[in-house]
């Protein structure tokens, strides 16, 4: 049996301000830092060890991973960064307040933008200063690979090749893997692992900073999954994420 641990980054400054974040590179709040440290303490207390970690190229995830590993005294672990683990791109919504958008467009429309599988938000213009095209961290990508908006289906399409080509082979070889990523890149992985339908994925919310453990068989099919720590607290945190897009 293999174990895989997924952690959504701790609370970010734009989580606190209830803004759509996407690929915008915002930092952790003090609460987010403490969430990341607590995840590390929890993993250490439960006896978890890792051989390899993966994260995105956005600082809220990379710093979550660092704080987590620091608490475990494992900052020396090899870490692989990939843009494919970035948060879903929220297009022209990036930087805008979710509740304000719900007041303007209605809760139902914002829910579609936030949680539907195949409906992206309005795209950024290529000339919009919020666009990441031209950002040095994406210099090795083709222009079309740096999105102007994404739906979850698009996020799945970039996450799964990375899973199949890098992460899954590492797990099969016996590596104990930790992934620190984002709400929607984790939703993309969970959708794939648990074979969640396009309709049911709308109801899945990932809380900040709580380790999600998957026990996988030899074919990397899930045997079970669970959040470490207080299950009721994890459920409340997920419910709080769900309510962010309401007026």
From Swiss-Prot:
Residues at the catalytic site: 9 (tele-phosphohistidine intermediate), 87 (proton donor/acceptor)
Binding site for substrate: 8-15, 21-22, 60, 87-90, 98, 114-115, 183-184
Site (Transition state stabilizer): 182
Family: Belongs to the phosphoglycerate mutase family. BPG-dependent PGAM subfamily.
InterPro entries the record matches: His_Pase_superF_clade-1, His_PPase_superfam, PG/BPGM_mutase_AS, Phosphogly_mut1
Domain of life (superkingdom): Bacteria
Pfam families: His_Phos_1
Keyword Transferase in annotation: no
Identification of the protein by name: 2,3-bisphosphoglycerate-dependent phosphoglycerate mutase
Metabolic or biological pathway, per its Swiss-Prot or TrEMBL entry: Carbohydrate degradation; glycolysis; pyruvate from D-glyceraldehyde 3-phosphate: step 3/5
EC number annotated for this UniProt entry: 5.4.2.11
GO molecular function: phosphoglycerate mutase activity
Gene: gpmA
Gene3D superfamilies per the UniProt record, alphabetical: Phosphoglycerate mutase-like
Organism phylogeny: Bacteria, Pseudomonadati, Pseudomonadota, Betaproteobacteria, Burkholderiales
Biological-process GO terms, alphabetical: gluconeogenesis; glycolytic process
Function description: Catalyzes the interconversion of 2-phosphoglycerate and 3-phosphoglycerate.
NCBIfam families with a match to the protein in the record: pgm_1, PRK14115.1
Subunit structure: Homodimer.
Keyword annotations of the record: Gluconeogenesis, Glycolysis, Isomerase
Catalytic activity: (2R)-2-phosphoglycerate = (2R)-3-phosphoglycerate
